[in-house]
Each structure stands twice: as structure tokens, then as C-alpha cells.
A protein has these predicted regions:
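Insoluble glucan recognition modules
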Residues: 1-182
């Protein structure tokens, strides 16, 4: 049998209810990206694979403190600080995985080849480029450092135009300041 994932995005004590006839229970977190419910991956992560359109606004609902979360500015812009849940998508239109990471309070975006496979760089320059390799770079901070595998913490670069990708890092925050030279 599988465990029932009772969870809430706010800390505190909660009364858990479960109806054995209808299998309805609470407190289940219900996160919506746009109009679509995100799927619980584990206790810290919810995700959805969907087509994102350049210039379109999307709303994330269900995270009470989302205004305090980091959003990858290579992928999204918060156009109105009074409405932090509304995000404008910046890169090229395509299939992406959007992950709400509660541990790091971060919205992570990954380019996808299919609903289950991460995109890779194609011969024509389309697809995705990944920053991987150790504990010296991470988003939103070094606490979420990349690994040697895109699936385990690699950073997807935003495809901003044909054959043009973008990754923004901040020395001392998302990049170990003693690990690079110019």
C-alpha cells in the first residue's frame, strides 16, 4: 500500500480528516500552475510538464508565502510586486517541467524533450544546455548546488532565441566566488 501524503504549505498543527467512502481528505496541498494542478513528487516538490509560451503570464496558486520564494529570472519575471503569484514567461515557447521546491522555496524550470525526458542540445542548436558539475554553482543558492547529472540538480539554461541560451549567476550566492577567474 502507498502512504497518503497529507501535507500543508504552512507550518503548524492541523486536524487531518479522511472520508473512507469518498477518499477525500485534508489538508492536501493543491497547487495550480495556470489552471492545471501540479503533481506531488515528494514532500518537498510538486511539478507539472506543460507547454509554456513566451510572453504569456502564468499564475501559481496554493503557496501562501510565494511572494518570498525565489523565481529564476532567466525564465520568469514578476511584473507586479503586489501580485507575486503572476509570472511572465521569458524564453522561447516550448515544453518545460515546472517544479515548486518547498525546501529551497524556489520555482525551478527544465526544458523537456517529452513528458518524461529532459531535453538535450540538438545538432541544429535547439533543445537545452545544462550547467552541471559539482558544488560550485546552484540556484537559487549554493545550498541547491548542481551535480554531474541534469536529473539531479543540473541547471537548465533559458533558450532566449535560436541558438542563444542564458544563465544568470551571482558570485557568492549562486556561484562560489573563490572558484572562478576572469
Amino acid at each position: 500500500t502507498d502512504a497518503i501524503p497529507f501535507a500543508n504549505s504552512n507550518a503548524g498543527e492541523f486536524t487531518i480528516t479522511f472520508n473512507l467512502l469518498t477518499f477525500e481528505g485534508s489538508p492536501f496541498i493543491k497547487l495550480l500552475f495556470g489552471e492545471t494542478e501540479m503533481t506531488m513528487v515528494d514532500n518537498d516538490n510538486y511539478s507539472i510538464v506543460t507547454t509554456l509560451t513566451k510572453g504569456r503570464t502564468y499564475t501559481l496558486t496554493g503557496v501562501s508565502d510565494f511572494a518570498d520564494w525565489d523565481v529564476d529570472r532567466d525564465f520568469f519575471e514578476r511584473a507586479d510586486v503586489s501580485d507575486p503569484e503572476t509570472l511572465t514567461f521569458l524564453p522561447m515557447t516550448g515544453m518545460y517541467k515546472v517544479t515548486a521546491n518547498f525546501k529551497h522555496r524556489y520555482l525551478k524550470i527544465e526544458a523537456m524533450k517529452s513528458a518524461t525526458e529532459l531535453a538535450t542540445l540538438n545538432d541544429d542548436g535547439s533543445g537545452a544546455i545544462w550547467a552541471i558539475g559539482g558544488m560550485e554553482v546552484g540556484k537559487p543558492t549554493l545550498k541547491n548546488a548542481a551535480s554531474w547529472s541534469p536529473e539531479d540538480g543540473g541547471l537548465c539554461l533559458a533558450r532566449v532565441a535560436d541558438k542563444k541560451y542564458q544563465l544568470t549567476l551571482v558570485a557568492g550566492i549562486s556561484l562560489n566566488a573563490s572558484s572562478f577567474d576572469f
